[in-house]
Amino acid sequence: IHLIWAQDQNGGIGKDGKLPWNISEDLKNFKKLTLNSTILMGRHTWESLPIKPLPNRKNIVLSSQNMPEVESYSSVEECVEKLDAQGTSTLFVIGGSKVYRNFIHRADELHITFVDKNTVGIDTYFPVTLLKIKEEFEKISKVDLGKEAVYTHWIRK
């Protein structure tokens, strides 16, 4: 299980139900990493997508509400059980905060883009501090994505 997100200097990941920035190199990297994989998100993340479903990926939503337009599950346990039964080899959790909180302890790898901004109006934060991440994960690579962002890849220790 992989978690993938971008955050600002304070751990901010969302503003008004959307990404608070538009960094093309980060979006390209997200696409490259998640293409031809299964992606899992919460209902709010699903609703914020400009294109539904994200193309060339199996889209799954975790929601307590009925979601007839997309494969969805109402609990983490049901979701994990079904994906295991389907033989899903790689799962990318793409948001939001509640879904990250439910999967961080199950994650094998993290893909974090650090955005060099202190964004105004952030209302959603990644639910785990970088200090806690560093206790459980080891950074194995770092790539500059232009002037505004740095992509990092972490594996569980």
Model-derived segments and spans:
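Enzymes that bind and transform nitrogen-containing heteroaromatic metabolites
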Residues: 1-157
